[in-house]
Curated annotation (Swiss-Prot):
GO terms for molecular function: DNA binding; RNA binding. This is Surfeit locus protein 6 homolog. Residues 151-174, 187-196 have a biased composition (Acidic residues). The lineage of its organism: Eukaryota, Amoebozoa, Evosea, Eumycetozoa, Dictyostelia. It comes from Dictyostelium discoideum. The keyword Nucleus applies. Belongs to the SURF6 family. Keywords: Nucleus. It comes from the Eukaryota.
Length: 396
């Protein structure tokens, strides 16, 4: 039993020395063997920290007797002596209670400070949320106005404006998310309203993108539905050649150059690659259905034909002009003669000279006189008929 007690004391001394090393780093100057063999000094107790040494607890359990001990409290100003009636266990309990009370008071103070900070942060976040709401309302009005403008403007301008709107909305959403994460006790109703508003804006943007895609598809359908290329028929040349039409003289020059290149390649063997490319290009054009005008003889013939038609139209134009001038001259002469005749009539009337009537039987047509043919021309003015229409009866 004595061996066990000695071992227990050694271990308790070693443990107490280790605790003292942790508390007082100055005790490290002593050697380890002295620290193990020596009895552990009583632990220092301050107002801020208190702990029970393992050796004191074991001694109190073995003896089970109340011993009076004097504890010294170190302070900066003065030393005080405690009443010697209390046991170390009771003292430790009281000190622990004091420490707990101090810690609780500190925690309360910290919580009060945190609550004040939280309230300040909540107020700032609420203000930010209100400003964000106003911004979102303004953005909605801007989006509505822009819709009306976008319908009138071109599609390119629509795309630019929508990209700007998307960037603005993404910035506002980032700000909202940062503010909501920073606030611990924010208003959840306001947060829900902001989410619904941002969601509605995103829905509008998605609908716009869908409408754009539909428009593009419709345009593509219009472009490729006007002509059915699935039939395998070649596209006509008047649709292929949208630019300026090349004249026949230019085509003749090109055809002559091609002939010259091909003839040189056959004779001398020069420019074989160029000749092959010319042949392949003409072959591909013919396969595609394009009219290849590379025959110089036919081109010369067509040029002569065009020149002949031009000469013919020029002659006809000159003749027409001559006839027009002659007719104009006749009309002018007739007009001048009529004007002169009217002037002479006026003069004769003033002089009192009466115009003699010319009796031309051929010109008479009414009153029963005159030619039978002239009397038949106007019905109702023939006068009395001296003959019948049937000449056979008259002969009989």
């Amino acid at each position: 039993m004595s061996d066990l007690k000695s071992r227990l004391k050694e271990t308790s001394n070693w443990m107490s020395s280790m605790f003292n090393i942790i508390k007082d780093p100055t005790s490290e100057s002593a050697s380890f063997s002295n620290r193990v063999n020596s009895v552990a000094p009583p632990p220092r107790r301050s107002s801020s920290s208190s702990s029970i040494s393992f050796s004191e607890l074991t001694n109190s359990n073995e003896n089970k007797t109340t011993t009076t001990t004097t504890t010294t409290t170190t302070s900066t100003t003065a030393t005080t002596s405690q009443p010697p009636q209390k046991s170390p266990v009771e003292q430790n309990k009281e000190e622990l209670k004091k420490l707990l009370q101090q810690q609780l008071a500190e925690m309360k103070l910290k919580r009060q400070g945190k609550n004040s900070n939280i309230n300040d942060s909540n107020n700032s976040n609420n203000n930010n949320n209100n400003t964000d709401k106003n911004k979102n309302d303004n953005k909605k009005e801007i989006i509505k106005n822009k819709k009306i403008k976008e319908e009138e403007e071109s599609e390119g301008e629509e795309v630019e404006e929508e990209e700007e709107e998307e960037s603005d909305i993404s910035d506002s959403e980032d700000n909202n998310s940062s503010n909501n994460n920073g606030s611990l006790n924010g208003d959840y109703d306001d947060y829900g309203d902001e989410i619904s508003e941002s969601g509605s804006e995103m829905d509008l943007i998605n609908n716009k993108n869908l409408n754009k895609e539909k428009r593009k598809k419709q345009e593509e359908d219009l472009q490729f539905s006007t002509f059915d290329f699935s039939s395998g028929k070649a596209m006509p040349t008047y649709l292929m050649n949208k630019g300026r039409k090349t004249s026949k003289k230019e085509l003749l020059e090109k055809a002559e150059e091609k002939e010259r290149i091909l003839a040189n390649s056959k004779r001398n063997g020069t420019n074989k690659e160029l000749a092959d490319t010319i042949r392949w290009s003409t072959a591909f054009d013919k396969v595609q259905g394009i009219k290849v005008k590379d025959d110089p003889a036919l081109l010369r013939k067509s040029i002569k034909k065009v020149e002949k038609t031009k000469l013919k139209s020029a002659r006809e134009w000159v003749q027409r002009k001559k006839e027009k001038d002659e007719k104009l001259k006749v009309r002018i002469a007739k007009r001048e003669a009529n004007i002169k005749a009217k002037i002479e009539e006026k003069k004769e009337r003033r002089m009192g000279i009466k115009k003699k009537k010319t009796n031309n039987n051929n010109n008479k047509s009414g009153g029963g006189g005159g030619n039978s043919h002239a009397s038949r021309q106007r019905a109702g003015f023939e006068g009395k008929k001296k003959f019948h229409f049937n000449p056979k009866k008259l002969i009989n």
